[in-house]
Amino acid sequence: MIPKTGFALWLTGLPSSGKTTLGRGVIGALRERDIGVQLLDSDHLREVLTPEPTYSSEERDWFYRVMVYIGRLLTENGANVIFAATAHRRCYRDRAREALDRFAEVYVDCSLEMCMSRDQKGIYQKALTGQARTVPGLQVRYEPPPRPALTVDTERHSAEECVRQIVDRLETLAFIGKERVNLDRIEEVLGS
């Protein structure tokens, strides 16, 4: 029996815009509905694939090709996938759109100033002190999606509200069935 193709959702935005937080929240909301989903978080994948990343153009091209390939393997075998990755160049996300049958892109919108204030990994500080030279939003341009399936504003809306918007959009796209989202449970998941 051939498994049903899973969906792929790409959360894109500047570093520290809230992609991983929202990815975890969406996973929690979907698991409450017995919908399995795998998070492919670029930070975690980098620890395995490029433990000492250079963030060069060549390395990023390779990394996002591998990330899309992993996503394709998962979705072709029925798994649902959420990518939480800046992927600052549109071509990275376009490659995923071309390779994955049921694909949607969510733009996690947040000002550079707010992202810098949220930065727990010190990415922006490294850029400002010259320790990093290719940080999206500062030294390299971030290319926002021209027509995302959804834009969520993590500066104006809570993580819970953004998760609700994303789950609603997954329903509208018919990636998942319609069901009421339990916001209390989302808050629990995001708090852990």
Give short role names for the model-derived ranges.
Residues 58-104, 108, 124-127:
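Glycine-rich phosphate-binding loop used to anchor ATP phosphates in small-molecule kinases
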Residues 1-8:
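Extreme N-terminal, non-catalytic leader segments
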Residues 44-46, 87-90, 109-114, 156-158:
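Conserved nucleotide-binding/hydrolysis micro-motifs of P-loop NTPases
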Residues 117-165, 173-190:
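Small-molecule kinase domains that catalyze NTP-dependent phosphoryl transfer to phosphate-bearing small molecules
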Residues 24-72, 76:
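Conserved substrate/cofactor phosphate-moiety recognition/catalytic segment
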Residues 15:
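The conserved Walker
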Residues 11:
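Hydrophobic anchor at the beta1->P-loop junction of P-loop NTPases
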